[in-house]
A protein has these predicted regions:
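Short, glycine-/small-residue-rich phosphate/pyrophosphate-handling segment
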Residues: 104-124
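N-terminal beta1-alpha1-beta2 submodule of the flavodoxin-like/Rossmannoid cofactor-binding fold
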Residues: 1-99
C-alpha cells in the first residue's frame, strides 16, 4: 500500500502540512510520499492558456503522483472560508487531463485545521 499526502497550502510553515505529515506517520509499514505544492507551482489556470500552451508538465507530474497512490491524505488550508488558490489552481489543471478523474478515483482521507474560530470546517 502506498499513501500520497499533501497539504493544500503553499505556506512554508503550513500547519496543514504538519497535520498531514503527522497523520501519514500513523500508518506504520506503509510506503509514504509527502508532496509539497511549492514543488508544483505553475501558471494560473485559464482555458486560453491551456489552448495555446497545453497542460503544464508539473500538472502531469502531480497527477502521476496521485495515480501512484492507494490512498490520498489531503489537509486543506482555509483562506477566507475556502480552500487556497494554490490548491484550486493545481486542482483546475489536473481536472483538464483527458480521460482522468480529478483524484484518479482514489480513496481520499480529507483533513483540515486552521487557527481561526472555524478551525477549517469550511473546506471539508
Amino acid at each position: 500500500m502506498k499513501i500520497v499526502a499533501f497539504a493544500g497550502s503553499s505556506s512554508k510553515e503550513s500547519i496543514n502540512k504538519k497535520l498531514v505529515t503527522y497523520v501519514a506517520e500513523q500508518f506504520p509499514n506503509v510506503e509514504k510520499e509527502i508532496l509539497d505544492l511549492n514543488d508544483y507551482e505553475m501558471p494560473i489556470f485559464s482555458v486560453d492558456r491551456e489552448k495555446h500552451e497545453g497542460i503544464p508538465t508539473l500538472a502531469l507530474e502531480f497527477a502521476e503522483k496521485i495515480d501512484s497512490a492507494d490512498l490520498l491524505l489531503i489537509a486543506l488550508a482555509e483562506h477566507n472560508s475556502t480552500y487556497t488558490a494554490a490548491f484550486k489552481n493545481i486542482f483546475d489543471w489536473i481536472s483538464r487531463i483527458k480521460d482522468r478523474k480529478h483524484f484518479g478515483g482514489k480513496n481520499v482521507f480529507l483533513l483540515a485545521t486552521a487557527p481561526g474560530p472555524a478551525g477549517g470546517r469550511h473546506v471539508v
